[in-house]
Amino acid sequence: MIVSAISPTRAKPIDPEYAALELTPENRFLAWANGRENVFLSGMAGTGKSFLLGLWMDSIQGVKPDVTAPTGVAALNGKGMTLHRWCGMGLGPKLFETDEADWRTCRTSEQVRQRVTACKTLVIDEISMLSGRHFDFLNFLLKRLRGNNKPFGGIQIVAIGDFLQLPPVRIDQSLAYDWVFKSKAWEEAEFQTTLLEKNHRQAGDADFIKALAGTRVGMLVGNAREILQARIRSNPPMNMPRLFTHNTMVDRWNTGMLAELSGDVKEFVGKPSGDAREVEAIGRSMLTPHGLPIAGKPTEPLRLKVGAMVMITVNNSETGTVNGQIGFVKSLPEYEDGPVIVDTREMGDVFVTPWRFTFRWRDKTAPKI
């Protein structure tokens, strides 16, 4: 059903420049993208979506497309920025609100207006994570900012992603997924769809590729289950990321790994400011009925050593770091409120300084932590 939902209603003819080429999915994508069609590029993991996008981007002369993604880490992987920041939609539209109402609360700076006005092509990576409501509002927003009633204000959209990998983000888990391909904006865009099918990441292992492809669509045939189970590691390397079901298990693991490192521990403690009663009330509100910290509460206290693996948990436009970015502590501050230097794969050394969180309690003056 998903395949039929995202297939184009009509395929545009290929530009004569590409007519003599072998009509591989890759060449179709290049032909449509260079012909300024709206294109949706999809395929299972390992089929080269990001590689093909990079190849196309490098071939463009003059103004390059603007690259975005729904999340900070995905945007960083594509050397771009979050879609929300790019278009100035802030936290995004409210689920049951109108576009006009959301527009009135949207704060688009002059920098955003200039960026949107100058844009010719917008790349949206990991499109499957974007909800239909957000995509519809993006369409509305670009039309309004550019004064152009064409789809997306006349900007070419190149969307990349796999709807069988990452679903759209849901604030309310009781609601069904708001798939972007069911939105009015998706229909209006008239995407030309390119599906990459050849797996390059596991090339040479045909049985494993078949097992992965079957898992992707929920169909394990033949000995696929045995092939996958044979890959289970009973003792994975210690530096591999781990997933746990409870925060207490996460804390226990992280504490144990920190103890394995040599050197001294440096402890960082938050400094609340504001009315004492407000600060106390906020502190209580961030605990569960059992007295445990709620999910999302800043780690208190934060204990670090040189060499510790850490994750950035906020987007910082000044440093370019994003929520979910991983690195290793390279050095600890020698003075109060000094920076922690973190070695990241994407950006090299970044300076992480104390971050201020603002909490509002009953609409009164917000204490700051």
PLM region spans:
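Conserved ATP-binding/catalytic motifs of P-loop helicase motor domains
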Residues: M1-I369
